[in-house]
Amino acid sequence: MFTFVILKIIMLNTPHFLSQYNSIKATALKLRYVTNTHIEPLLNSLSQKFTKSILGTSEAGRSIHGLKVGSGPKRILIWSQMHGNESTTTKSLFDLFNYFESPDCEVLLDACTLFIIPILNPDGAEA
């Protein structure tokens, strides 16, 4: 909880977050449901700022993707789509990934190391 509050304060104090939103919004994810098929091209296009990996596979053999960004001592785990049909957070994560490319985020990425699983339940996302 405390780390979330720090993260939120840093985000709110970033001077241009709201004015940049239209330029950072991930417009490729417009569908109601999001699956690995939708996010894999976006993951492949992320900059070298992100360390990408396959954390494992689902029961049906689908990849569970992981990302690491930042280098700070506060370590934060973020996941989305534990329930496969709940994709709103996944869409928001890709907005956030675009925002991390902004120089405004260096303070955050120097303070925190974020471990991110964009789709925790890829089988549920396909159902």
Region annotations inferred by a language model:
Residues 2, 6-127:
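Structured catalytic-domain cores with a bias toward divalent-metal coordination
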